From Swiss-Prot:
Compartment(s) of residence: Cytoplasm, Cytosol
Molecular function via GO: dioxygenase activity; iron ion binding
EC main group: oxidoreductase
Cofactor annotation: Fe(2+)
Binding site for isopenicillin N: R87, Y91, S183, Y189, S281
Name under which the protein is recorded: Isopenicillin N synthase
Source organism of this protein record: Penicillium rubens (strain ATCC 28089 / DSM 1075 / NRRL 1951 / Wisconsin 54-1255)
Lineage: Eukaryota, Fungi, Dikarya, Ascomycota, Pezizomycotina
């Protein structure tokens, strides 16, 4: 059987985005622009984040947490007692039905006295954490990782802004530590023998899937994953495999970027192939603040005019998350 063709996913050295050399930054921006208008994906290399430590700490957490602890941390979709946990917490596997499981946490600055927590603004939650005695150092590591990947994402947003002919802070001015709605999700895809048939979906083309086609609900997504190829991107000739790289971050635009650029930078449609191997998928969904709104424009037109209406990030995120669950089910 012939192997699936590989998608063009370039490796882009993003280190200039942390510096002051505008000529070098523009080289990165041009590479981001080309990737965004091709498959929609690129690998960010020389990103400055210790991904091996991330992988090791995540594996340690996944293999040490008990079923009882998972239940105590479970989001409302699984544990009805946790009415305030819509996004943050543990997403359970379900025997014979669902194999994947994950732990999601939000902005560490969302503490009980945060104004947007106090006002019960939707999509804002206080994180829940496992017992420090049972998982020493995990919370400290996880919160620090949030800010590490936040810093990388800020640099990437500067690159996207330059790629679109805007000022460097065009996106990052809306991406603030005090109120960004970004999330880290530590996803575990386990090896199971036997693997429950009900946990495997089948696409129209016969491909076995773990998660069906979708666009990301984000401005951009910054993903670390194991060295196990699993993602496919839809192109005119069909779905193409994305090669894995466990030293780099896989970056793509979400549907908010597609909306505000009139689809000049589309959100690539992609899916997760079923692979019965132990692996990690650790996305950072780059989300702006609830009240932030980026005015849509069309970069392909000299006057930039578009019929796309402005939408606040909070409204976009609420609607997008609900739509994704309705389409593909609870993750």
């Amino acid at each position: 059987m012939a192997s699936t063709p590989k998608a063009n996913v370039p490796k882009i050295d993003v280190s200039p985005l942390f510096g002051d050399n505008m000529e070098e930054k523009m080289k990165v921006a041009r590479a981001i622009d080309a990737a965004s208008r091709d498959t929609g994906f690129f690998y960010a290399v020389n990103h400055g984040v210790d991904v091996k430590r991330l992988s090791n700490k995540t594996r340690e957490f996944h293999f040490s947490i008990t079923d009882e602890e998972k239940w105590d941390l479970a989001i409302r979709a699984y544990n009805k007692e946790h009415q305030d946990q819509i996004r943050a917490g543990y997403y359970l596997s379900i025997p014979e039905k669902k194999a994947v499981e994950s732990f999601c946490y939000l902005n560490p600055n969302f503490k009980p006295d945060h104004p947007l927590i106090q006002s019960k603004t939707p999509t804002h939650e206080v994180n829940v954490w496992p017992d420090e005695k049972k998982h020493p150092g995990f919370r400290e590591f996880a919160e620090q990782y949030y800010w590490d990947v936040f810093g990388l994402s800020s640099a990437l947003l500067r690159g996207y802004a330059l790629a679109l002919g805007k000022e460097e802070d065009f996106f990052s001015r809306h991406f603030k530590k005090e109120d960004a709605l970004s999330s880290v999700v530590l996803i575990r895809y386990p090896y199971l023998n036997p693997y429950p048939p009900a946990a495997i979906k089948t696409a129209e083309d016969g491909t076995k899937l773990s998660f069906e086609w979708h666009e990301d609900v984000s401005l951009i997504t910054v993903l670390y994953q194991s060295d196990v190829a699993n993602l496919q991107v839809e192109m005119p000739q069909g779905y193409l495999d994305i090669e894995a790289d466990d030293n780099a971050y896989l970056v793509n635009c979400g549907s908010y970027m597609a909306h505000i650029t009139n689809n000049y930078y589309p959100a690539p449609i992609h899916r997760v192939k079923w692979v019965n191997e132990e692996r990690q998928s650790l996305p950072f969904f780059v989300n702006l603040g609830f009240n932030d709104t980026v005015q849509p424009w069309d970069p392909s037109k000299e006057d930039g005019k578009t019929d796309q209406r402005p939408i606040s990030y909070g409204d976009y995120l609420q609607n997008g998350l609900v739509s994704l669950i309705n389409k593909n089910g609870q993750t």
